[in-house]
Amino acid sequence: MHGLRVGWVVLTAFVASMVVVYGLMSASVYLQSVGTVKALGVGVYWDSGCSQTVSSIDWGLAEPGAVKNVTVYIRNEGNAPITLSLQTTNWNPSNATDYISFSWNYSGQTIDLNHVIGVTLSLSISSNIEGITTFSFDVVVIGSG
């Protein structure tokens, strides 16, 4: 009977350690986000024909360590050539910026009146993220010139 107990303890310890190891190996934390897009002096669209306005971006579920990309099209809707700048605001929770970064591939080129460029927006989630299960923030695209 004593041998059976020792065997059960060893089996229980083995199973428990496998659960811990599996938990360490599998990042099953998914983050959900929706970001609002505000445009100043420009239009931001889902298509190059500028018929589908972007008002928000649903990043969907993202695992730790993931990079999510979306392509948008930005049109100069002002009356002079412009360059673009980007800001993010209203991060919720406020510490999300410790683990989540946002960037784009715009290279600073001048955009003439009514011209359209494609831009990739990227969301990067740190593999060390903790304590955040949902987040949101606003993206502000500014055309100036």
Question: Model features per residue range: what roles?
Answer:
Residues 2-57, 61-62, 142-145:
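Short, polar/proline-rich extracytoplasmic segments that appear immediately after membrane translocation
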